[in-house]
Amino acid sequence: MQNKIIIHGARAHNLKNIDVEIPRDKLVVVTGLSGSGKSSLAFDTIYAEGQRRYVESLSAYARQFLGNMEKPDVDSIDGLSPAISIDQKTTSKNPRSTVGTVTEINDYLRLLYARVGTPYCINGHGAITASSAEQIVEQVLALPERTRMQILAPIVRRKKGQHKTIFEKIQKDGYVRVRVDGDIFDVTEVPELSKSKMHNIEVVIDRLVNKDGIRSRLFDSVEAALRLGDGYLMIDTMDGNELLFSEHYSCPVCGFTVPELEPRLFSFNAPFGSCPTCDGLGIKLEVDLDLVVPDPSKSLKEGALAPWNPISSNYYPTMLEQAMASFGVDMDTPFEALTEEERDLVLYGSGDREFHFHYVNDFGGERNIDIPFEGVVTNVNRRYHETNSDYTRNVMRGYMNELTCATCHGYRLNDQALCVHVGGEEGPHIGQISELSIADHLQLLEELELTENESTIAKPIVKEIHDRLTFLNNVGLNYLTLSRAAGTLSGGESQRIRLATQIGSNLSGVLYILDEPSIGLHQRDNDRLIESLKKMRDLGNTLIVVEHDEDTMMQADWLIDVGPGAGEFGGEIIASGTPKQVAKNKKSITGQYLSGKKFIPVPLERRSGNGRFIEIKGAAQNNLQSLDVRFPLGKFIAVTGVSGSGKSTLVNSILKKAVAQKLNRNADKPGKYHSISGIEHIERLIDIDQSPIGRTPRSNPATYTGVFDDIRDLFARTNEAKIRGYKKGRFSFNVKGGRCEACSGDGIIKIEMHFLPDVYVPCEVCHGRRYNSETLEVHYKEKNIAEVLDMTVDDALVFFSAIPKIARKIQTIKDVGLGYVTLGQPATTLSGGEAQRMKLASELHKRSTGKSLYILDEPTTGLHTDDIARLLKVLERFVDDGNTVLVIEHNLDVIKSADHIIDLGPEGGVGGGQIVATGTPEEVAQVKESYTGHYLKVKLQQ
């Protein structure tokens, strides 16, 4: 078999007809600047062709469901294996998708509980077991010899009434004795029962002494008792002991019933097992009292009830005033000072009690009626669910929040599933086991107490679960829980989960293509990830990893550097060889960083800030352990810590949302904290994340940064435009007039293929240029508007150098390292890192107030060390203007450049949530307990 993948003439995107050889069964890292063509080579050429060939080998019938895959622009590829891509863009946003379902661990857990689980009565009556007549007979015969007993069939359990017809039927069926409320009577001599009291009635089927030769009689009596007692029977051993048996999974005491244990009972995605209240989501949209009464110190007259604000309408305030007068509630008392009964009345209504309501609207319409008072919470709920108006529904939605389901307590399953425990009544139910971190889950599996029979059944199931948990542990995800929603995972986390699933499959001879698996991973966990990658390689697989992490590069078997620049300045193979060979290559920027010839210098001094702080006290969301944190303003701050230590919770869930709530009146509720101070020192909050800058191809760098408005102004001022009477709007592809109407200014036509993927083809009228021919006849410096949109940022900067207003905005895009993108490049084609830098560019040309807080979550994602150097210069410009920049980051080059570090830990999950170290990088490097400090110390010494 060929030991190389040989590629000839690859031309996808910016690749310049390249030839490259990649060794098989090795760990190969593809690196290079952002936009240099790494992904074009790895994903759009190698993976696309591997996938296409696999699909081509399937039948025509199967292919119609998979769609026809386009052949990548390449002359030939030899030595390809079936390819599996593990990227970061395919995270499921479905609320039913969890870590447990993605890794298939849930499937094995469901099987485990169905096979060795024991149901327990939810009312505390002990284990619920189902026994056949044969099993009951065996248990009775196991009682001590000469035990006197009577077999009873329970027919009435805790029911009121005289039950005369039941006694008549018992007599008719030929039975002689009954036990009523614990006393034995002849069926003809039962005293009259009280109608208003609850009674228990059992029929005496037989009286026996346990001795040889009674099996046959006992069996007949047991069957008769089960038949008469609807599957239940009691054995009264005359010495005061009673044994309860059932041939159903049903509690003999209270009748709580469990269906037959099967895997679907433990699935929250099946109606059979899901919680009936939340339909298996674990959360329910409920009215949030904190949003309904945002300021409890206000009285009802002062507008304590936000949904009934008199500004929008006086209907509900009038109703409130008249109802409170009728029920004797003082409208001038602060809401928090009302009695509990009064608050319940205001919130949930008066029930059946009515008041007289009189109201005249602005048009003279009158309402004069006696009605119950609805209550504000009930009112918001009703209007949300009953309205046909999207506007009203959105307004009501603003007073609601997704709260933990009160029925299943967030476990997603019904009572019948949650009453089943493994390892005895003290053992966990499936909901509790899913709430454990991966590390704790592993420990629990090792300590599980099972009977010999249960161990035999559970052994192969537990092995599968254990293996999958171990793989997750090995890729640095030990802090995650199986119940964690897949939509809340970062790109790096979801990729490593799928990586763990692939390791678990133990396939060999496969070509795996990974996109920056080290994202979101602390340096401490990186070694474990690299070991996992090597393990996959050692199974006989080829791994092609697009990566910027130096450790991964140095441990690779083969390194390919794509460059030298980005966009049209990239697309060539600059270096290919072992890491040591690439490090010696003078043309390779990557090689220069690996050899230490190029590096990001440590700042000569740290900024002292402006002396002000934002201080959070008692941060206790998720795993945060009631932290008190100070964020010094006017500095470059890095929040660090191992994966799962609580960085995102502190910054994104608490700080960002609390500031947004105060500054922007954002309805999004922050996580749990006691108090926050210092927000008055901030005027603007700018969250610069990696979400797309636009959801449609109509959004592009020119429109996003606002430079397109200036360019359209310029074209409208040309002589040709003035002669034709064209205004600025003529040069927009979003409105009628100048755009091509055949494609509505998209430049492409979408052809719906029904069960195949939609196909996009260039518009035949405008040939992809978006405008009609008349608009394209207007030129500025011999270029029309479509040609300007096709220019790269670098070219546009030269082209518009004489127009300072335009050049200044374009310069900011170049400053963030995006000189290679075209002005009209669709936003949907930009990577997360490129979108984030585009947002930075749009901030750069705004006038700085010096009171802005910029928050960035892992801004180095997708960035080469050379790009990081550029990014740091941009961030430092913000700080030098007096603003505060706060980053969540693992990259040591960024961390060492910060003025102030807040290091969380020491571990992830329950072992984290504490502040391990704070201060300058030099101070944190001296803290022995800090993992970040340990790696930072080495970096600072370099």
UniProtKB/Swiss-Prot annotation:
Keywords: ATP-binding, Cytoplasm, DNA damage, DNA excision, DNA repair, DNA-binding, Excision nuclease, Metal-binding, Nucleotide-binding, Repeat, SOS response, Zinc, Zinc-finger. It comes from Streptococcus pyogenes serotype M6 (strain ATCC BAA-946 / MGAS10394). Residues 308-589, 609-937 form the ABC transporter domain. ATP binds at residues 32-39, 641-648. Forms a heterotetramer with UvrB during the search for lesions. Pfam families: UvrA_DNA-bind, UvrA_inter. InterPro entries: AAA+_ATPase, ABC_transporter-like_ATP-bd, ABC_transporter-like_CS, P-loop_NTPase, UvrA, UvrA_DNA-bd, UvrA_inter. Transmembrane segments: none annotated. It is found in: Cytoplasm. PROSITE patterns: ABC_TRANSPORTER_1 (PS00211), ABC_TRANSPORTER_2 (PS50893). GO terms for cellular component: cytoplasm; excinuclease repair complex. The UvrABC repair system catalyzes the recognition and processing of DNA lesions. UvrA is an ATPase and a DNA-binding protein. A damage recognition complex composed of 2 UvrA and 2 UvrB subunits scans DNA for abnormalities. When the presence of a lesion has been verified by UvrB, the UvrA molecules dissociate. Belongs to the ABC transporter superfamily. UvrA family. One of its GO terms (molecular function) is DNA binding. One of its GO terms (biological process) is nucleotide-excision repair. This is UvrABC system protein A. A zinc finger (C4-type) spans 251-278, 740-766. CDD domains: ABC_UvrA_I, ABC_UvrA_II.
